[in-house]
Design a protein with these regions (language model features):
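Generic structural signal for well-ordered alpha-helical scaffold segments
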Residues: 11, 16-17, 179, 209-214
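Short, glycine/acidic-rich hinge or "gate" loops at secondary-structure transitions
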Residues: 1-6, 186-195
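Acidic/histidine metal-binding catalytic segments
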Residues: 251-257
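Conserved short loop/turn motifs at secondary-structure junctions
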Residues: 103-111, 192-197, 226-232
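Active-site palm subdomain of RNA-directed nucleic acid polymerases
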Residues: 174-192, 222
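Conserved catalytic palm subdomain of right-hand nucleotidyl-transferase polymerases, strongest
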Residues: 94-103, 152-162, 203-246
């Protein structure tokens, strides 16, 4: 905003757009034990207890299985980033996205060039020591209506974590390296659908339909088992996940980060 080549009118226009993107939503009164709750703090505590009860994870003392390492896969133990990569990641942040500290995606996009250099230096120093700042792990949880059920019931809402912008950019760098490592070394099965570029659950659905029709044509019996893991992302067994990462040769400061 200190760029004086931008007119005052243009600066004011940018500020208005930034303010316009700051949208806040409220949860209607909740009914708990036949009592209508309107106090925001009490509603927050109700959601906190409910979401926490649905996100239990295995004990940290549970020992993961002893998995043999894949010696044919090269080790992924360090990484570096660059201002160009950071700027690219920032450009992909949705402009309407707001972090819990109130920084919008639009604002980050506007200052992407001057901050990319400093950000890449910071990230590279963190990668060298294998450290992920504790403050970046703290998320603000907001309750989002599922579009099903009574709006007065806590069970009709799901939790959404709003992380700091720096945390999300840092995670994006790690994700790109880990995904590339898995793809280049055929770690991910070709039956995986979604979470991959150029693939989606639509492809998986087409595969299932094709398999069913092909077997019908030759009078074969078709059987399928569908599993739905409730709150899967909230119940990640971290010790088991680390064991799996070790198995595919992810270690060193990359794993520590």
């Amino acid at each position: 905003m200190n760029n004086y080549s931008i007119s005052a009118k243009k600066k004011f226009s940018i500020l208005l757009r930034l303010m316009k993107n700051l949208k806040f939503s409220t949860v209607p009164p909740l009914v708990e034990n036949d009592v209508t709750i309107q106090d925001p703090l009490i509603k927050s505590n109700i959601f906190n207890s409910f979401f926490a009860s649905k996100s239990t994870v295995p004990s940290s003392n549970d020992q993961p299985p002893d998995l043999a390492r894949n010696d044919g896969v090269p080790s992924l133990d360090s990484l570096n980033t660059s201002p160009i990569e950071i700027a690219k990641i920032i450009r992909n942040i949705k402009k309407s996205q707001i972090s819990y500290c109130g920084i919008s995606g639009m604002f980050i996009n506007l200052i992407s060039q001057p901050i990319s250099q400093s950000m890449s230096k910071l990230f590279n120093n963190l990668f060298k020591i294998g450290h992920f700042p504790d403050l970046w792990k703290i998320a603000h949880i907001t309750a989002v209506y599922k579009r099903a059920g009574l709006k007065t019931s806590k069970t009709s809402y799901r939790p959404i974590s709003i992380l700091p912008t720096l945390s999300k950019i840092f995670e994006s760098v790690i994700h790109e390296r880990l995904l590339a490592h898995c793809m280049e070394n055929s770690v991910i099965t070709d039956k995986q659908a979604a979470y991959l570029k150029g693939d989606s659950t639509t492809h998986q659905l087409l595969y299932i339909v094709h398999t069913i029709r092909t077997n019908w044509d030759i009078n074969k019996i078709i059987q399928a088992i569908f599993l739905d893991v409730s709150a899967a992302s909230d119940k990640v067994w971290h010790n088991g996940l680390i064991a799996k990462l070790n198995q595919i040769e992810v270690d060193g400061n990359f794993l520590n980060t």
